[in-house]
Amino acid sequence: MLPWQRQVPTSIFPQSNEQVFRMMLAQQHLQLQNFLQQRKMALLAMNPEIPMITDLKKAKFDFTHMADSIESEQKIKEESVSPKMSPTLTTAAVRPFVPYDQPWFMIPGRGRTTGRAARPKKEFICKYCDRHFTKSYNLLIHERTHTDERPYSCDVCGKAFRRQDHLRDHKYIHQKDRPFKCEICGKGFCQSRTLLVHRATHDPNRHSIGAPVVPIKSETPLPELDPRVTLILQNLTDSFNSTSMTSPQISPDR
């Protein structure tokens, strides 16, 4: 006999805590039995072909068709254990849940991420002019323009530089080897940027205003022009000069 099935004698005295606990257990047991009975009836109403679990226990195992018996029992157990919808609800009444109206890649904060937040860029600020730099080395070189610090000095002539690469380029001056040579005149230079500046001197169209143009020395002489062509050019030049000299000028009163 279960504890909650015992008969409690009536008394005029108030019930003890143990008796109250037994009554609560009995009430919960009845509610659980009612719930299981209602669920069993609902399953039978939806699919009457599904046998009850008690019938599964009583059925004998068919050893001749072992694989088929195992699959059928497993299928029946899954269908009986899986939750079913209430028979009062229909599929038309159930609407699909749409959490977002926009695609996932347009929703803020739901795009593709690398798994960690982007690190902010470091800023190195000059203490003299408040200029910002993204690398500490660039800030160090910049501050040397304010302090005029030149830690790299030449061991030949003693000239000092702010950057090590400038000292490296300077050392080419003391060497006979000049790796950057001009293809036109063959002159050698220590630095590539000096060669680029030198190449502009061979191009008359690229020289600056007022700067002397270095003529290009060519081994093959230029061909002589026909005397008739020279005479025509001279006549055109004279006529242009005479026209510009005798052209009427507009009076400012008009």
Swiss-Prot record:
UniProt keyword annotations, A-Z: Developmental protein, DNA-binding, Metal-binding, Nucleus, Repeat, Transcription, Transcription regulation, Zinc, Zinc-finger
Keyword Lyase: no
GO function term, MF aspect, one: DNA binding
Compartmental location: Nucleus
ZnF C2H2-type span: 124-146, 152-174, 180-202
Disruption outcome: RNAi-mediated knockdown results in defects in feeding, and failed growth and development eventually leading to lethality at the late L1 to L2 stage of larval development. Morphological defects in the digestive tract, such as enlarged pharyngeal intestinal valve lumen, leading to functional defects including accumulation of ingested bacteria in the lumen of the posterior intestine and defective elimination from the anterior lumen of the intestine.
Gene Ontology cellular component annotations, sorted alphabetically: nucleus
Main location: nucleus
Source organism superkingdom: Eukaryota
Family matches, as InterPro entries: C2H2-ZF_Transcription_Reg, Znf_C2H2_sf, Znf_C2H2_type
Family designation: Belongs to the Odd C2H2-type zinc-finger protein family.
The protein's role, per its UniProt record: May function as transcription regulator. Required for morphogenesis and function of the digestive tract.
PANTHER family: ODD-SKIPPED - RELATED, PROTEIN BOWEL
Protein name, UniProt field: Protein odd-skipped-related 2
Natural source organism: Caenorhabditis elegans
Gene: odd-2
